[in-house]
Design a protein with these regions (language model features):
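Short catalytic/ligand-binding loop motif for oxyanion handling, primarily in non-cytosolic enzymes
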Residues: 21, 54-58, 101-108, 202-205, ...
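Acidic/aromatic-lined carbohydrate-recognition and catalytic surfaces
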Residues: 2-184, 188, 201-253, 263, ...
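Loop/helix patches that line or flank the sugar-binding groove of alpha-linked glycan CAZymes
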Residues: 4-5, 228-244, 251, 259-273, ...
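Hydrophobic residues within beta-strands of alpha/beta enzymes
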Residues: 46, 194-196
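Beta-strand-rich binding/interaction modules
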Residues: 508-526
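C-terminal beta-strand-rich structural cap/linker in extracellular carbohydrate-active enzymes
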Residues: 533-552
Length: 552
């Protein structure tokens, strides 16, 4: 576990990071060009979103060739160079693989459509019901039915996601063999990590049936045989190598995640789960607006941290990624008077937890949601689908746009803001997605020139994790659970105790400090606090972490 307990992983959405060709799309050489910046931040691994050949119906998660590079991003030589140059800087490369489905443009699916029985069995082809309707009533994660009818046929194929993303049948050993070959191909290329997309939906039941209680997910989420599949994947590919693996787990539960990530189970290094990012979803609905339920947020964090600590599971720690709106205006305040303290509060909240922190590109400089005003500014397939769905459900276009400004995945996919030049220094061409309007004020160049910027606070967080074993693997205990607006916890090991306090409020707040920490060292504060007392008055959005050495 130590190989990833001290690391911080930085997520790059290649399409939006840095463009070296002027075509408006970020590329692999653009990541290589910015390695020195990432080394200065202190991260030790870069997770890249998909860069494979793809029709780009779901921004690369519709993969048409697992072992090639889309010319949009460069060539295989560029990936080889990136891996080599990153390694020189003690940075590993983690790639994103989608093992649940392929693009309908993938040769496997094309051969299946052409009637090849070998590849036909790679996918879920099923006959329509007697009345011609889809085989089941399952709902796609992107809206609509999860089955698509083949033209001129009574057959359908299953797609839990976009209609161009056909689900693979993991019960077929030939499918598993082909996917293991893909993973080993990239290990041989020097890749040191894998982020495995929607991994816990790969195991479907033998018989697919209607769901009269929901949308079908209860049949395939953490489905039958999932742990056996992951053990086989581990054994056949990355198991005996120093490879870090993280599984993205959709609508999962703690018990399964402990099994996925406990090293004794020999499945994965860690898991992504999203329960904490649904605390502003009324009745679990993403496309309705509501305030964050802070008590629920605290409860989720504490429950997962305690269970994972006690049962030796391992969490990926994150607020932001390419599928989520940015956290800054969502979980804290993006108002100018609170901007710095909110951004640093969010960073400290998860970086002192037990797990491996992930920093999403731009988070370290305080990038925010762009809140584009019209649907013409958005390109995300899920957003465009729901623009139509929500209006059909009776909302006005203006009401729908207010939801999209807060919920769209494009919020986190706007180009990285490097400087105050045209297009924020991202490209000399026309960017594939608009640059946020605040790029003149919020950018890397400005952050690096100010030693009290959000960037340097994140740099300190990353360095502290490398330095202190108690942050890496110490036990986790909730603290001050009854205090509203306060999220706090203790970390401890044989030699050290750590108390991390985070005030999610816009007003001052008084708390009592436990006696054991009255002589503690201030490890980190976003208000430059130097002294502490038994009664502390916390400032708005203050984060304070104390460290106390235990007496021998």
């Amino acid at each position: 576990m130590t190989k990833f307990a001290q690391k911080t992983i930085y997520q790059v959405y290649p399409k939006s990071f840095y463009d070296t060709t002027g075509d408006g799309t970020g590329d692999i050489p653009g990541i290589t060009a910015k390695l020195d910046y990432l080394q200065e931040l202190g991260i030790e691994m870069i997770w890249l979103n998909p860069f494979y050949p793809s029709p780009q119906n779901d921004n690369g998660y519709d993969i048409a060739d697992y072992t090639a590079v889309d010319p949009l991003f460069g060539a295989m030589d560029d990936v080889t160079t990136l891996i080599k140059e990153a390694k020189k800087r003690n940075i590993g490369i983690m790639i994103d693989l989608v093992l649940n489905h392929t693009s309908t443009e993938h040769p496997w699916f094309k051969k299946a459509l052409a009637g090849d029985p070998f590849y036909r069995d790679f996918y879920y082809f099923r006959q329509a019901k007697v009345d011609g309707s889809p085989p089941t009533n399952w709902v796609s994660k992107f809206g609509g039915n999860a089955w698509e009818k083949l033209p001129g046929s009574s057959e359908y194929y299953l797609h839990l996601y976009d209609v161009t993303q056909a689900d693979l049948d993991w019960a077929n050993p030939n499918v598993r063999e082909a996917l293991f070959d893909v993973v080993n191909f990239w290990i041989d290329k020097g890749v040191e990590g894998f982020r495995l997309d929607v991994l816990n939906v790969i195991a479907k039941p033998k018989f697919l049936e209607d769901d009269f209680e929901g949308d079908g997910r209860r049949f395939y989420t953490d489905g039958p045989g999932i742990h056996a599949y992951l053990k086989e994947l581990h054994e056949r590919t990355f198991g005996d190598k120093a490879i870090i693996t993280v599984g993205e787990m959709s609508s999962t539960d703690i018990d399964n995640c402990i099994r996925y990530s406990n090293p004794d189970e020999k499945e994965l290094s860690m898991v992504f789960h999203f329960h904490h990012l649904k605390v502003d979803y009324p009745d679990g609905e993403k496309w309705r607006l509501a305030d964050v339920n802070f008590e629920n947020l605290k409860s989720i964090f504490h429950t997962w941290q305690v269970a994972m600590s006690e049962e030796n599971g391992w969490d990926a720690l994150f607020w932001n990624n390419h599928d989520q709106p940015r956290a800054l205006g969502r979980f804290a305040s993006d108002k100018p008077e609170h901007y710095y303290h909110s951004a640093t509060l969010l960073g400290a909240t998860i970086h002192f937890m037990r797990g491996t922190p992930f920093v999403y590109m731009g988070e370290e400089i305080g990038m925010m949601n762009p809140k584009f005003p019209t649907i013409d500014d958005y390109v995300d397939v899920e957003t465009l689908n729901h623009f139509d769905i929500l209006q059909k459900n009776g909302l006005s276009e203006q009401e729908v746009m207010e939801i999209i400004k807060e919920r769209s995945r494009d919020n986190s996919r706007t180009p990285m803001q490097w400087d105050d030049s045209q297009n924020a220094g991202f490209t000399t061409g026309t960017p594939w997605l608009k640059v946020a309007d605040n790029a003149n004020e919020i950018n890397v160049q400005t952050a690096l020139s100010n030693k009290t910027s959000i960037f340097y606070f994140y740099q300190k967080l990353i360095a502290l994790r490398k330095e202190h074993p108690v942050i890496q693997t110490g036990d986790y205990t909730p603290y001050l659970t009854e205090e509203d607006s306060i999220f706090a916890y203790k970390r401890s090991n044989e030699t050290t105790s750590l108390l991390s306090i985070h005030h999610f409020g816009s007003e001052k707040k008084k708390i009592q400090l436990p006696t054991e920490f009255l002589n503690a060292e201030v490890l980190l504060s976003n208000y430059e606090r130097q002294r502490i007392s038994s009664e502390l008055e916390l400032a708005p959005y203050e984060t304070l972490t104390l460290m106390q050495m235990k007496k021998a």
